[in-house]
Amino acid sequence: MKSEIHQLFNHIDNVPQVPEVVRTLVSQASNPNVSLMKLLKMLKKNKLFQ
Amino acid sequence: MKVLRLVNSAHFGLSRKIGSINQALVLLGMSELKKLVITSGIISVMPELPNMNIEDFWLGSFRTATYAKWLAEESKLENSEMLFTAGLISNLGNILIHLGNPVAAQEINKYIEAGDSRPDSERQQLGYTNQEVCAELCHRWQFSNDLIDAIDKSGEPLAFKPISLPACAIFVAKYISDFNNKDEEQFLADFPVKEWQQLGFNEQDIAEKVAIILDLDTGLEGLLD
């Protein structure tokens, strides 16, 4: 990473963090082996779905 | 902003109210449900900025995501779902630049309004592009290398060898997404023909296929309510 980009991130108080369910769903797009049941369980627990 | 509320909105036109994730999965399918959760989740963590119209920003991102997925499917790229996500988040670097260096962000906008290109203006003011910033954010979010690479190269896809077709899809999708800001003659004159051809499309099909793309419904506007 360029040092200038590192500096930009250092100037941001709260760099956004992605929810775990989103990380899993995005990685699942390139990994068909992730279990559907595991995803359903995660979605049921996540407040984004309520 | 909640997924269940959107699923039960008029947009989806479901005959009965959905109350559980299992019902949503059966009626919408996994692909559609994933799109909604990913989009909702990313919107939820990005801040609103006083000097940026965040609703316009997200509407543009929804269009870019939807168009990138369509382009990927039409040109038989391997991972159209990845292209949806990449298109959705490909502009997040702009938000981070506004957050971390608002003065430079305003300067860049002035240069662009004066007719300079965004990549040139960003490099001049910052030494890097918003796509590189977004790629670093995706790296921190532990997204896949394919997605990071596509976003990193999506500002100027032809500048990299070998040429990244996912980056070309995002670039063309973003250009079409910005159609509202241009008159039709200017839109066609500036159309990224080389990136379009890299995706396997013919130059003479631009008008016909763009009309199809502009008719696509993102179905995501309800997430901004």
Where are these regions (language model features)?
Chain B
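Conserved alpha-helical "signature site"
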Residues: 1-88, 92-103, 117-190
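Post-HEXXH active-site segment of zinc metalloproteases
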Residues: 102-113
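Juxtamembrane helix-loop transition sites at the ends of transmembrane segments
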Residues: 50, 111-112, 163, 195, ...
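Terminal helices and disordered tails flanking the catalytic cores of nucleotide-processing hydrolases
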Residues: 193-225
